[in-house]
Amino acid sequence: MNYRKFLIAALLVMSFSVQAKDITVTRLTCEMREGRVTISDAPRLGWQMSSPENGTRQTAYEIEVRDVWAGKVVWNSGKVKSARSQLVSCADAALEKDRHYTWRVRVWDEADTPSAWSAPSDFSILTSEAAFAGSEWIGAITRKDARIPEGRKYHGSELKKPEAKAAWAAVDTLAKKSIYLRREFHVAKKVKDATAYVCGLGFYEFSLNGEKVGDSEFAPLWSDYDKSVYYNTYDVTSQVKKGGNAIGVLLGNGFYNVQGGRYRKLQISFGAPTLRFRMVVNYEDGTSETIVSGKDWKYDFSPVLFNCIYGGEIGRAS
């Protein structure tokens, strides 16, 4: 009988040991996005727990945040008794802005068994001023030179008025066109990491060395363009190569520049298609290089002959 009890106890210990070893934490997210993320305030983090045992549940977690540039841990949540695993706030961390961080997490199950630490993920807390420092808005033509009418009144019966028709007829046709913007740069050292910050209005498609970056078709998100605009951050470390590199950005009108054609509900424009861009390349030797949008960029017309958020698109066959 004692032998049976010993055997059962041993099997239970082995069972818990296997479970502890097999509990893993994956799919780390920051603001519900995987991969490198840039935010402007305290992050909200998420993860998934995986176990081969049915019914395994999280009862606690611990988060550790490291400042990459300082090379040290700057915050640890300690063991927090909670089943929460999504949108977990780090407001208590009081993390500094304009810094780059990595983070990892471990969890405990219902038997109070801890998992191993997850693989690290990363995020940056940057103000938009820091993200686009030194860059300029660029495009084929400025709003002033394009003679674009001001205001949001051009819809419905207002569009039929002679003065409205005359105002829109006077707009320079260059302000309606889709354009390509291009900038070349040279890399002579081994790249540690590279990050690009892109705001292309109304919509943009970003490519590096001829390959599209990201999978968005309508970036950035729409906004009240006279109040705020959104931008995207990309980890382009794997796409920057030694030697010559070329940045390409295709711009379209989107809701930023609705000038009508084929079909319309309204006409409103905040300006011709425009770009603000900054890329930071960090090298293994500790130096870095920054490429920003400015007067040294080149532009040309794209194969898109017509584009309107309501009227669709006409392209030139290659």
Question: Which stretches of residues belong to each language-model region?
Answer:
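Predominantly extracellular/luminal regions of secreted and cell-surface proteins
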Residues: F123-W137, R143-E158
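Recognizes extended acidic, P/S/T-rich segments that occur
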Residues: T56-H100, E110-W117, A133-R143
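Short, solvent-exposed loop/edge segments of extracellular or virion-exposed proteins
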Residues: R27-G35, E136-R147, A164-K165
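Bacterial N-terminal signal peptides that target proteins for export
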Residues: M1-L7
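Pro/Thr/Ser/Gly-rich low-complexity, intrinsically disordered linker/stalk tracts
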Residues: K21-E53, D122-A130
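Accessory beta-strand-rich segments of carbohydrate-active enzymes
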Residues: W47, K81-S82, Q86-V88, R99-R104, ...
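Hydrophobic h-region of N-terminal signal peptides that target proteins for export
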Residues: A10-Q19
